[in-house]
């Protein structure tokens, strides 16, 4: 899997070179309007380059030129597995891990691996006990931003991300992105055993178990097996009695989010949270 090499083309490359030479003269402010295919506008302010389209600031001209691909629609990095293209190399590399299964980010505390550094940093809060996200409504704190957002919606019932195709709305942008695959018919997950493709990773993972006939997560108390670690965690509460979801109206606690959500729905007058 490798990026396309045609990139911005010779016209933009020459323009970038000229811009760098002009900036090196020491001008504090440099504006450049290109009439080429990219139609970009670059601004040099002090030691930074600012994009006139969105206001993003960069310390290198090369970074700004690369950023401009977002606005021009240029996507030089193409996945050879599924044909999906990306304007940024970092997004391309991250996408490729879907096909390769690579998870280069490892937790030094427990050995769990992740395909993104941001996921590792988020996971590490489990070990540190850090809860940086505080609800302004009730004061409850959370380790994960996603959980914090989900909790906040129990107060507002707001779903910010709407699908332009069917009108369905979601709490998270990631949920909307996942949903959009229904309309685009994208199936980025391919089984290496039989070649079957899937829209969602969860379905792909369950399918892969039909080849291995395994449920890797087993309860030490009763021996029941699960496909996912979070399913085992949820099941374990039936043995430990842990109830992490608390209704602030009645100070009632729940072991499962579904039960907590049902209780919250009662308080909200029957609205879906």
UniProtKB/Swiss-Prot annotation:
GO terms for molecular function: DNA-binding transcription factor activity, RNA polymerase II-specific; RNA polymerase II transcription regulatory region sequence-specific DNA binding; zinc ion binding. Its main location: nucleus. A zinc finger (C2H2-type) spans 49-71, 77-99, 103-127, 133-155, 161-183, 189-211, 217-239. InterPro entries: C2H2-ZF_Transcription_Reg, Znf_C2H2_sf, Znf_C2H2_type. It comes from Pongo pygmaeus (Bornean orangutan). Belongs to the krueppel C2H2-type zinc-finger protein family. SUPFAM superfamilies: beta-beta-alpha zinc fingers. It is found in: Nucleus. May be involved in transcriptional regulation. Gene3D superfamilies: Classic Zinc Finger. It comes from the Eukaryota. This is Zinc finger protein 80. One of its GO terms (cellular component) is nucleus. It holds the Pfam family zf-C2H2. Keywords: DNA-binding, Metal-binding, Nucleus, Repeat, Transcription, Transcription regulation, Zinc, Zinc-finger.
